Amino acid sequence: MHSSPTSTRKQASFAASASAQPRKSISFINPSKSSAGKGYAASNPNKLAVSRTMGFLTDMKPAEKLNVPSAKTVQVLDSKGVDVTPRPLYHPDPHAASAKPNKLLTSQEGSLGSDYISSYSLYQNTLNPSMLGQYTRSVLGSSSVSKSSISTTESMSEDLEDSSYKRDRLASFTDVRVLRSTAEAAISKEELEKTIEIILTETETLRFFDLPTVMFSTESEEAEKIIEKNKKYETLCRNRLGNDLYVERMMQTFNGAPKNKEVQCEKIILEEKGVVATTWDLYDSYNIPETLLAAKRSGYSSKGSLPAKDRDPKIQDSESSSLMDIENVILAKVQEDEEDNSEAILKSDKLHQDLFYMERVLMENVFQPKLAAYRQLPVYKEHEPEEPEETLQVENLKVAEDEPKKEDEEEVEMELELEIATEQSTIPANLERLWSFSCDLTKGLNVSSLSWNKANPDLLAVGYGNFGFREQKKGMACCWSIKNPMWPERIYQSSYGVTSVDFSNSSPNLLAVGYHNGTVAIYNVQSSHNIPVLDSSESPQKHLGPVWQVQWIEQDRGTTGDDKREILVSISADGRISKWIIRKGLDCHDLMRLKRTTATGGKKGGEKEKKGEALISRQAPGMCFAFHPKDTNIYLAGTEEGLIHKCSCSYNEQYLETYRGHKGPVYKVTWNPFCPDVFLSCSADWGVMIWHQDTVKPFLSFYPTTYVVYDVSWSPKSAYIFAAANENRVEIWDLQISTLDPLIVNVANPGIKFTTVLFAKETDCLLVGDSDGQVAVYELRNMPTASDTSRGDVINILLGPKTNHTG
């Protein structure tokens, strides 16, 4: 291959400075396209480490340069014409879009014109651009071309610039930039649905303020060291006093910088008060003691053995001063003794006992007529005071004159008394109020339960507590005595309402109390302390609902019936009937768990079949119970469903019988004391029913009012008299006289509700509790009496023969 003219000119122009090494020439088959006018010269990125002498086509005209086709091939020939063109190390993608040539290796100072491109020096970096892919564009942009360094040994013309190499170079740099700035691949749906585990770890604790404690527990590990250290310090302080080993000296310490802080508080109200004491006030205050002392001194001086004239005035003055001192000491001593004695007297038990008896005597004097009527005794009349003899003589003369008149008056009085007696015999039965057990502590509380003491008929236990859950207040149980109706003998206050009370039979000093929170407590009334002897507050088997009734029951231990033991039975709203045995605390066992029952019986004609209601709880809340008076193994239980179940202590899984009749909660069930097969019940459905234990339906039903009946009670003296407490009145029924209307009706005051009734044991009196905290005592007057022989047969006559009851 022949050498181009360019090579000839290149050899001729650089002949003087050429070296002995062989020359290389570059031939362009396709000249460069349009590189003129650009102010930079491009270097071949495929050549490394050395600079070669290149010639520029400076003789070509701009017009000829414009005619050079764009495609070109670069060949490097040595002096012998051998092609030594180096192969490119980087092969760009032909399909990749060529970006605009960026001036990566150009000077940052500006661009050169075409007139100054003919000769300048290019300092090429000895680094392959393909190796710069790891660096950023700032590194690539740091290469620059100096306009001022023009070399004659190595020059290049813009016309000889290889455009293909330039394009390759720009593409390579573009690829490098694209690889660095490529965005992350899009996340697919499968990757989004994958579960990613994120582990949260605790960061380091940042302490903004740490105040070390100066107190340590005696049970801590450091307690022994601290105690030993404190002892050493104490011994050091003791040995320091008077010891020559210790010297006091001054030392400067750093005090903490004070900090002012503002705190918001309530307004401080200031008040000014002044007291003025005049000289006359002071004189009057001290004048009275001085006059008393002067009077006493005069008394002492009058008892002297020597007259005042014979004595020395100095001796008199000394004696008077000594006497004053002695008197002051004696008076002070007397006052101290009086104060000490007064405190001891007020706190003595003997004084309290004397005051207790004195109070009872005064109450009996005040309530003597009422107490006599309660005990059915004659009323004591006070004696008239005796008159002097003169007045008696005058009166005797008058009496002698008025005797005929008095006889006539006595006859008239006798006739009036007979008329009154006949009128009283025709007066119907009624209630006369005697007194009421009430005080300031019971004012406004609801009377929930009444119970007589079995050993002392004059002692009454009263429970105070509301029935409703939202009406709960503080409760109280009191023991009242008939000898003092104004104040209770014992007071047991609690945070919960009292729902039931009952005295023990074998131990009359024990009082059982049931509370609204499910606690059962036992108090000893012989003790003045208000702390219960036993309670179930911490028992794991305590009731979960209000304890509506508690009662002491004597049960047979053996088959003979002589050996009996007493247990405490309670019924609660949680559906449990439990017995409590006093051994080591309160030992609880369930007699029965009341379960809800579904209604039985076919539907009547024209009645639609009712759908079964979903049961919220399987347990039926219990409201009351009553043990059989003859067989204590059998008892009745009234529920909130309106059913009465007959149960046995030997079977705790099923009922012996179920009595249906009430439509509301059964509040009270009680056996007839003279006819043990008949019992009485009252309910919130306004009704009172009489049942026979062999028949599941009631024999008699009483609906006199449209009010709730809270309590019923049989009379202890008659088999057919009972009392019922409605909301607004108390009714006394006599089944022998009428089964339609009550015998006596006593209406309550406005705003007051009757809650409990209880007959007195030994008298014809009735106790009625109300919602205002009063227990009124009424005397039953003109009540009909039944013959003793027919007591147990009247109920059977009213209900029919027993053979007809079965079935």
UniProtKB/Swiss-Prot annotation:
Function: Plays a critical role in the assembly of axonemal dynein complex, thereby playing a role in ciliary motility.
Compositional bias of kind Polar residues: 1-11, 22-31
InterPro entries: Dynein_IC, WD40/YVTN_repeat-like_dom_sf, WD40_repeat_dom_sf, WD40_rpt
Tissue: Highly expressed in tissues containing motile cilia, including the trachea, lung, oviduct, and testis.
Gene3D superfamilies with a match to the protein in the record: YVTN repeat-like/Quinoprotein amine dehydrogenase
Biased segments, Low complexity type: 32-43
Name of the protein this chain belongs to: Dynein axonemal intermediate chain 4
Comp. bias (Basic and acidic residues): 308-317
Repeat (WD) residue spans along the chain: 493-533, 542-590, 617-657, 661-701, 704-743, 749-788
Pfam families: WD40 (PF00400)
One example of a Gene Ontology biological process annotation: hematopoietic progenitor cell differentiation
Highest taxon above the source species: Eukaryota
CC per GO annotation: axonemal dynein complex; axoneme; dynein axonemal particle; motile cilium
Cell compartment(s), UniProt: Cytoplasm, Cytoskeleton, Flagellum axoneme; Cytoplasm, Cytoskeleton, Cilium axoneme; Dynein axonemal particle
SMART domains membership: WD40 (SM00320)
Primary location: cytoplasm
Subunit structure: Part of the multisubunit axonemal dynein complex formed at least of two heavy chains and a number of intermediate and light chains. Associated with axonemal dynein subunits such as, DNAH2, DNAI3, and DYNLT1. Interacts with DYNLT1.
Classification via SUPFAM superfamilies: WD40 repeat-like
Region annotated Disordered, chain positions: 1-44, 300-320
Record keywords: Cell projection, Cilium, Cytoplasm, Cytoskeleton, Flagellum, Repeat, WD repeat
